[in-house]
Amino acid sequence: MYEKVNPQHPDKIADRIAGALVDLAYKEREKPHVAVEVLIGHKTCHIINETDTLLDERDVIEAVKRITRNGDIVVDYKSVPQDNYLNEAQKKKVVCGDNGIFRGVPTTPEQRELTRIAGAIYDMMPTDGKYILDLDTNSLIICQSNIGDGDTHETEYYDELYRWLTHYKKVVNPIGNWYGGTDVDTGATNRKLGSDMGDAVTGGGLHGKDLSKADVAVNIYLHMKAQDYGRGLSAYCHIGSDVVYIDGTPHDYGKIVEAAREYVNDIGGFEKLAEWGLIHP
């Protein structure tokens, strides 16, 4: 079984804001050091950014308002310098920014199918949504906000879902219509890694960090290689190291970072990566 959330889930909104700030940092310099945490809910967005790259607070606020679709949200933004020891460690060449353990695995047919369904629903209804698929029992659970409760003009959405997904045993909005979003639920960075990474394992979060952070670069690299090889790969690294051990064999961290950079650029940046994670429509 697998659970997927869409880009309007509050946790994904937090991830997307964090990703947008990383994108802003990369516009300022080629190799920024960034670690962003976001907590959002009930008309307030708190952000702490540990970084060596000064961002214009107006750009930060604009990104928050754009992603939340809320021009009145209160933004509490705090930017602090990265720890000097961590910053100095990266001065000569890119090295692992922290200790980490990782496992990349091939995406399963179940994960691909649910992600396809979630993406198609989101194209039709771009509001907060969460979905579960269990192919063993052919069961599909859809919790989609703002689509009616059976007594409104919006019930055509239900009809469309039932027509479109006839081969699944479906439950749609089991307690009726709901409105979702950050006024109903709070969101925080890196709380939906199961949705983002499937059966993969990571010691840290995927979002809100620059590519020197192994939590970003190694997770992306192992995901790509697992798809290529059709099998799982395990890795570990330690802070300050220029190698990552993948299935016991040392690999150059700089090359891993460049492969991850190409992946992020191809997908459209860190904010785009945060929309669906590594398993995307």
Task: List where the protein language model places each region.
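A domain-level signal for the structural core that forms small-molecule/cofactor-binding pockets
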Residues: 1-281
